[in-house]
């Protein structure tokens, strides 16, 4: 029996930062299937276009009524009557025909908006899973050509200290994460992470005062830390105090494009201070040396966005220097885009992809980006955005694609824990068929 789409309705809802985003209800004979899309704070210039209204009289210009209108008036009439199990056909129709906008890196979604297209793409996936009478993660595995008899539960990368564009402190690096690779299961990994998180909170309160334990957009703390060493020392202390030394490692998201000066090709590690300390302005080569020193001193297993999104040369230098032992993740560099992934492969610029579905704008393209990365023995980290919703799609996606790692914030704030809680449910439902990535999080079963 064909399960055709009978109705599509889009609406404007609020994300976790209080900004509007797109939610879609898609109806078939089996029911209503809902999806909501996230948005990022530090976005790469090569990401697919997130369509905003720019009407300053509503939501300070951040409304998404244009994207809603595009769904209800342009996309919906074309999709009604189509079979919800035709994921690739529907995604291609939206991306290539109904939108059709392109740039040098591929389909840009600048006409209809990646937020409009992705919301429908996710809802179609949920409807397709129901039509096939399987869970969403099993259906996504089928779409990706993965075997569905053995699923991999990811290591959670929990963002517990915030800096950069996510915080009001002086810290230039954006995220410091704890990575419980030594746990025997996802359930235990989450427990390790939560215990380290609460221990860290106590350490911060003791050292910086109670005000320093307020949480940021992703649930992490933003104490008045001045540099990366101070943040890393705090994490090492918290991990040790919680009893998980050796079992919980550290990851960083530097988001270096946020403090890169393209005119003189330098990185300002004091970019949040009006009269910055000139000794903290570094060349790319100096930054390479800084990362190498940090990796020697601390149990760092992953560094994301260590350089600007166009600084291919220093990416390649760092990957050559420490890539064997440390995951070098290209976020703003790659923006989940297969064309940019191909360029990075040619240049040996990095060795891991952060998979953010809203950077590319459709589930079909996101799966393609993941498979291309895995085929070339890269790590793949499925990732949230700083502006999230209660939608848990990425939890099913990470299990389906067997990437072995997920980044979706601290074990705090409901829009973050919603994803972790969904992973607990999936692990429980899989029983003995669940494999936890653990120490092998970089290269999982493909």
UniProtKB/Swiss-Prot annotation:
Keyword set, alphabetical order: Acetylation, Cell membrane, Cytoplasm, Cytoskeleton, Glycolysis, Isopeptide bond, Lyase, Magnesium, Membrane, Metal-binding, Nucleus, Phosphoprotein, Ubl conjugation, Vacuole
Cross-link (Glycyl lysine isopeptide (Lys-Gly) (interchain with G-Cter in ubiquitin)): 138
Membrane topology field: Peripheral membrane protein
Cofactor section: Mg(2+)
Binding positions for substrate per the UniProt entry: 166, 175, 304, 331, 383-386, 407
Catalytic reaction equation(s): (2R)-2-phosphoglycerate = phosphoenolpyruvate + H2O
UniProt xrefs under Pfam families: Enolase_C, Enolase_N
Residues at the active site: 218, 356
Positions of post-translational Phosphotyrosine modification: 139
Pathway recorded for this protein: Carbohydrate degradation; glycolysis; pyruvate from D-glyceraldehyde 3-phosphate: step 4/5
Chain ranges for the short sequence motif DKSLVK motif as given in the UniProt record: 277-282
Modified residues (N6-acetyllysine): 133, 375
Keyword set includes ATP-binding: no
Gene3D superfamilies linked: Enolase-like C-terminal domain, Enolase-like, N-terminal domain
List of residues that carry Phosphoserine: 42
Positions of Mg(2+) 2 binding: 253, 304, 331
GO cellular component: cell surface; cytoskeleton; nucleus; phosphopyruvate hydratase complex; plasma membrane; vacuole
GO BP, sorted A to Z: glycolytic process
Family note: Belongs to the enolase family.
UniProt comment concerning the protein's domains: The pentapeptide insert motif is required for the stabilization of the apo-enzyme in an active closed conformation, independently of Mg(2+) binding. The motif is also required for homodimerization. This motif is only present in Apicomplexa and plant enolases.
UniProt name for this protein: Enolase
Organism of origin: Plasmodium falciparum (isolate FCR-3 / Gambia)
Lineage: Eukaryota, Sar, Alveolata, Apicomplexa, Aconoidasida
């Amino acid at each position: 029996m064909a399960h055709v789409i009978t109705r599509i309705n889009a609406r404007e809802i609020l994300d976790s930062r209080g900004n509007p985003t797109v939610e879609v209800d898609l109806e078939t004979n089996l029911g209503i299937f809902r999806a909501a899309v996230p948005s990022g704070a530090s976005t790469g210039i090569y990401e697919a276009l997130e369509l905003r209204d720019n009407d300053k009289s509503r939501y300070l210009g951040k409304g998404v009524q244009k994207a809603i209108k595009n769904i209800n008036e342009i996309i919906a009439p074309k999709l009604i009557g189509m079979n919800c199990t035709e994921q690739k056909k529907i995604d291609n129709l939206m991306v290539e025909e109904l939108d059709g906008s392109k740039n040098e890196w591929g389909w840009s979604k600048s006409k209809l908006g990646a937020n409009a297209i992705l919301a429908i793409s996710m809802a179609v996936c949920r409807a397709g899973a129901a039509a096939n009478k399987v869970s969403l993660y099993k259906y996504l595995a089928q779409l990706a050509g993965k075997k569905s008899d053995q699923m991999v539960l990811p290591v959670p990368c929990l963002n517990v200290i915030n800096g950069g564009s996510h915080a009001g402190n002086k810290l230039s690096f954006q995220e410091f994460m704890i990575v419980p690779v030594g746990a025997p299961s996802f359930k235990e990994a989450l427990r390790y992470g939560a215990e380290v998180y609460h221990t860290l909170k106590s350490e911060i309160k003791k050292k910086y005062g109670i005000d320093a334990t307020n949480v940021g957009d992703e649930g992490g703390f933003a104490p008045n830390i001045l540099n990366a060493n101070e943040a890393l020392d705090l994490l090492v202390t918290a991990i040790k105090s919680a009893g998980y030394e050796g079992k919980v490692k550290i990851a960083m998201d530097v988001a270096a494009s946020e403090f890169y000066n393209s005119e003189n090709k330098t990185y300002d590690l004091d970019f949040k201070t009006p009269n910055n300390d000139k000794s903290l302005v570094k060349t790319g080569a100096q930054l390479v040396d800084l990362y190498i020193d940090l990796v020697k001193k601390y149990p760092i297993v992953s560094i994301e966005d260590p350089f600007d999104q166009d600084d291919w040369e220093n990416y390649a230098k760092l990957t050559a220097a420490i890539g064997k032992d440390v995951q070098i993740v290209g976020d703003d560099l790659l923006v989940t885009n297969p064309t940019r992934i191909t360029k990075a492969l040619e240049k040996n610029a990095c060795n891991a992809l952060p998979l953010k579905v809203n950077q590319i704008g459709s589930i079909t393209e996101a799966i393609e980006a993941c498979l291309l990365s895995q085929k070339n023995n890269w790590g793949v980290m499925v990732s949230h955005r700083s502006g999230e919703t209660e939608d848990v799609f990425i939890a099913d996606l990470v299990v389906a694609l067997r990437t072995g790692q997920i980044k979706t914030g601290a074990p705090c704030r409901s829009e973050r824990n919603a994803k972790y809680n969904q992973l607990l449910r999936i692990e429980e439902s899989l029983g003995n068929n669940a494999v936890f990535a653990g120490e092998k999080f970089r290269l999982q079963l493909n």
